[in-house]
Design a protein with these regions (language model features):
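Short helix- or helix-capping micro-motifs
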Residues: 10-13, 106-111, 138, 160-164
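Short acidic/glycine- and proline-prone juxtamembrane loop motifs at membrane-interface regions
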Residues: 28, 49, 115, 121-128, ...
Length: 608
């Protein structure tokens, strides 16, 4: 019966993941990993930091099996390791509990969770790292539950080191798992063997990574820069507007689905923790330490927007405790508790919850991919593509052959070039009349399980009448589903191209949660003629100024400013000095001719 349950669970897990393979590139890191398979260049973020040396090496070896197409290679590798990971995690939990049934059901719970249904088959490093983590748990458990030869201790140490080399972020989970295992080994000789092999294996992949960066100095500079970004963004700014309770929900509850799915899982885990403590289950300590340390670090330091995917290394610990809780209920009810039926219902609920998003991902192009394919079909050869920062990797990988730049960088170089067509590639659904929008439906699973990006993407031709150069005090574009804007700081300076226009029209707004009752801003043309804009909540303020001939500089000077992080009652970490939002700019009645279109390139680059 126990083997039948394990086999049935394996079949269900395989079917769920193999039928949920993504059709095209979707998320930010996917393009970077694909480019790394073609050319491993960690300093240029191919792949993203911190390098993933073992993952990319395995992907390069597997590439011939998938026709040397990086996207297929990485999705195939993720699918294979998802199935292998289930088997390994089942073995690991069986080793720790001594119960094949509990092992199978614990692994089944983890691999049918909404977090895994969505993320396990993406062309990223998570799935393989989780399979290696499962192998590490199994081997560490074997070393603690059996009288093993020292070779098994070496195997456990190697598995832990390879897991870290596959995805370095997993060190936060692997180190406490390995460290607690070492402490529980029977002798100092065994402990020395474990630490020795772990250090040797880590040194091997670390030396390869340093060699790929060129030198120890370059490696240190690269990693220091990434650490500084992590401290500024993930551990600080990204937590804007979120309370501690909201962050905890993001990392601990959301991976298991909505409340009606997550609460039973967490309750079972709490029951399992009680049972483990009551029985003084020594072999459970490494897994409990793994999850506890990882969750503590995540809650204190990691970006909550990506909390569900970032929580993956700690979730096997929750699944293990839930498996203990299930086994406890089965014991006290004398097998009246039908555990496999309960887990089957959970899997059904998890798929019902994530299915609408999974089916879109499987059957249709992701919005960024669809937008880029459309852009390749309409943009002339001399066009410049201005991408939103979240779409930089997509542009690098899928728009080769085009000039691609960030919005302000492109406007600075080509804003005055009326002979150069400009297109904006935006990570949002535009309201521009000439824009083309590509979108998926975004159910609750999208909101809770993803970073909130790439549900829609747009291609927007940028008319010469709406171009300007942000010279001073103008923030980069920010977008939501309802529009886009640029914050103006203590003073904003804008340069306009010479179109022979008679006037320029500017639109200002402020959000509904604006901390000031109202604000006034003086807009002047080259220090000459000026107009005052009165900006209030819920209204658009439009001002128009006459323009002299030639290139023109506009200066916008608000009367009041604020710093979001200093506003009482807000949870903001934004320390910028802000005043009002610029939501529109257009020169009226231009006399310059529109740019002549150059015949577009006939070739397309296929990906996915």
């Amino acid at each position: 019966m126990q083997r039948a349950i394990f086999l049935g669970a394996a079949v269900i897990v395989a079917l769920l993941h193999l039928t949920s393979l993504p059709r095209t590139i979707w998320e930010y890191d996917e393009s970077l990993f694909c480019m790394a398979v073609e050319n491993y260049d960690p300093l240029n973020h191919f792949p993203p930091p911190p390098g993933y040396p073992i993952y990319i090496a395995v992907a390069k070896l597997a590439a011939p099996l998938f026709g040397y197409v990086p996207f297929r290679t990485l999705t195939g590798l993720s699918a294979f390791t998802a199935i292998a990971g289930f088997i390994l995690l089942g073995f690991a939990f069986r080793k720790l509990t001594g119960d094949t049934r509990a092992g199978a059901l614990g692994a089944f719970l983890f691999y049918t969770s909404p977090a895994m249904l969505l993320h396990a088959t993406l062309p990223q490093s998570d799935s393989g790292a989780l399979a290696l983590l499962a192998a590490s748990i199994w081997l560490c458990g074997k070393c603690l539950t059996e009288e093993v030869d020292t070779k098994w201790i070496a195997f456990a140490a190697l598995a832990c080191a390879i897991t870290v080399g596959w995805r370095l972020q997993f060190a936060i989970a692997v180190v406490p798992l390995f460290g607690m295992t070492v402490l529980l080994l029977r002798s100092w000789r065994e402990r020395f063997i474990a630490v020795q092999w772990f250090a040797i294996a880590c040194a091997a992949w670390l030396i390869a990574l340093i060699a790929a960066t060129g030198s120890v100095e370059m490696f240190w500079k690269w990693m220091s820069g990434q650490a500084a970004y992590f401290a500024e963004h993930d551990a600080d700014i990204s937590r804007t507007g979120r309370s501690t309770a909201q962050i905890a929900l993001r990392f601990i509850s959301h991976p298991w689905g909505p409340k009606w799915l997550a609460l039973p899982v967490l309750a079972l885990a709490a029951l399992g923790l009680f049972d483990a403590a009551k029985r003084r289950l020594r072999v459970a300590l490494p897994v409990i330490a793994m999850s506890a340390v990882y969750f503590a670090f995540a809650l204190a330091m990691m970006d909550p927007a990506d909390g569900v995917r970032y929580a993956l290394p700690a979730l096997p610990g929750i699944a293990f405790l839930a498996a203990l809780g299930i086994a406890f209920l089965r014991r006290i009810t004398k097998d009246v508790f039908v555990d496999w039926a309960v887990l089957a219902l959970y899997a059904f609920g998890a798929y019902a919850y994530t299915g609408p998003l999974l089916r879109q991902r499987t059957r249709s192009d992701a919005p960024p991919f669809a937008a880029i394919q459309y852009l390749r079909s309409v943009a002339p050869r001399n066009a410049v593509i201005l991408y939103d920062l979240p779409l930089k990797p997509h542009s690098q990988y899928l728009l080769r052959g085009f000039t691609r730049m960030k919005v302000d960088e492109g406007l600075m170089r080509f804003g005055h070039r009326t002979d150069v067509p400009l297109y904006e590639l935006t990570d949002s659904a535009t309201q521009a009349p000439d824009g083309k929008v590509f979108r998926w439906n975004t159910p609750d699973a999208y909101t809770k399980l993803t970073r909130g990006h790439y549900g829609a993407a747009s291609v927007v031709p940028l008319p010469v009448t709406q171009r300007f150069l942000a010279l001073e005090g103008i923030s980069p574009p920010e977008r939501t589903r309802t529009g886009s804007w640029r914050w103006i700081g203590a003073r904003g300076t804008i340069s306009l191209p010479d179109l022979g226009a008679r006037s320029v029209r500017l639109t200002f707004e402020v959000p509904l949660d604006y901390p000031l009752a109202t604000n006034r801003a003086t807009v002047s043309v080259d220090g000459g003629q000026s107009v005052v804009a009165e900006v209030t909540k819920g209204k658009k303020t439009v001002v128009e100024l006459p323009l002299p001939p030639g290139r023109v500089t506009l200066r916008i000077v608000p009367e009041q400013t604020f710093v979001p992080a200093n506003v009482p009652g807000r949870l903001s970490r934004d320390r910028r000095t802000l005043s009002i939002m610029l939501t529109g700019l257009e020169q009226a009645a231009p006399r310059a001719a529109a740019p002549a279109a150059i015949p577009r390139a006939g070739s397309k680059r296929a990906a996915g």
